[in-house]
Regions:
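A short beta-strand-turn-helix
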Residues: 68-86, 114
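Structural alpha/beta surface segment adjacent to cysteine/selenocysteine redox centers
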Residues: 84, 89-180, 246-253
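C-terminal cap of thioredoxin/glutaredoxin-like
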Residues: 24-43, 48, 91, 107, ...
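N-terminal low-complexity, Pro/Thr/Ser-rich intrinsically disordered segments
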Residues: 36-75
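N-terminal membrane-targeting/anchoring regions of envelope/secretory proteins
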Residues: 10, 15, 29-32
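C-terminal motif of bacterial Sec signal peptides marking the signal peptidase cleavage site
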Residues: 19-22
Length: 253
């Protein structure tokens, strides 16, 4: 049972939050929920963390030179922010209602306050939960949008229309409609969606999440800390500010 708020030492546990704010894998085919929390990790703030969408680290497979280029472009397309800034890696599922809740309440403000300000570098990893019927197709389609440097626009559209996907059996037409809405090159997008290379990126994201014992969405690697759940923005800011302070203290030792 979720525990009530309590005081937490910043270097051991950034935040305690008493409501259910994350999608879990579920035991009987239905979504479970977990309590938002933050735990210390063991990564340097500005060096590549263990969860990172960079081709050299992910191991995504490329059978041809064209596939290799596709993977690199897709990987780069889901990064946002200065290269020397502290990493914040989001692990998410486009059909998870708590991921949408976090996105709708926090993403624009996070971009304004931290990404555009040069304080953090944002990356997105996919964890399409099996309880969400269309999450994998959405993840793969978003990486095809990333190839055209419109990952974040497509992610915005997927979260905006999340409810529409609940009532359709085949998501293909809806995925293409969203691609047209953001002016993607449609022949390229359609061809990309059949690419084994794109599938390998999403599959490898899942392997990375599993190896890091991430089982719920949204989860975030914030500098040295793993944060789980759709924290309110002010609490998420405190998590980032604490991680930034830890990184600064390490640099000045």
């Amino acid at each position: 049972m979720p525990q009530p708020r309590s005081a937490c030492r910043a270097t051991a546990l950034l935040l305690c939050f008493s409501v259910l704010t994350a999608c879990g894998r579920g035991d009987a085919g239905s979504a479970s929920a977990v309590t938002a929390k933050a735990e210390p990790g063991a990564v340097s703030a500005t060096t590549p963390p263990p969860l990172l969408p960079v081709t050299a680290l992910t191991g995504a497979t490329a059978d041809t030179l064209a596939d290799s280029v596709l993977i690199q472009r897709a990987d780069r397309g889901r990064l946002m922010g200065r290269e020397d800034a502290m990493w914040v890696v989001m692990i998410s599922d486009f059909q998870c209602p708590y991921c949408k809740q976090w996105h709708d309440s926090s993403m624009a403000r996070l971009k304004r306050d931290y990404i555009d300000a040069g304080k953090i570098r944002m990356a997105y990893l996919h964890l399409p939960l099996s309880i969400h019927q269309h999450a994998r197709a959405q993840a793969e389609a978003s990486m095809c949008a990333a190839v055209q440097d419109k990952f974040w626009d497509y992610a915005e559209a997927l979260f905006r229309d999340q409810r529409a996907f609940q009532s359709i059996e085949n998501p293909g037409a809806k995925l293409e409609q969203l691609a047209r809405d953001i002016s993607l090159d449609m022949p390229s997008f359609t061809k990309c969606r059949t690419s084994d290379a794109i599938r390998s990126i999403v599959a490898n994201d899942e392997r990375q999440a599993s190896q890091a014992r991430v089982q719920s969405t949204p989860s975030f690697l914030v500098g040295d800390f793993m944060v789980q759940g759709a924290l309110p923005y002010q609490d998420f800011r405190r998590a980032i500010d604490t991680a930034l302070a830890v990184a600064k203290a390490r640099r000045t030792r």
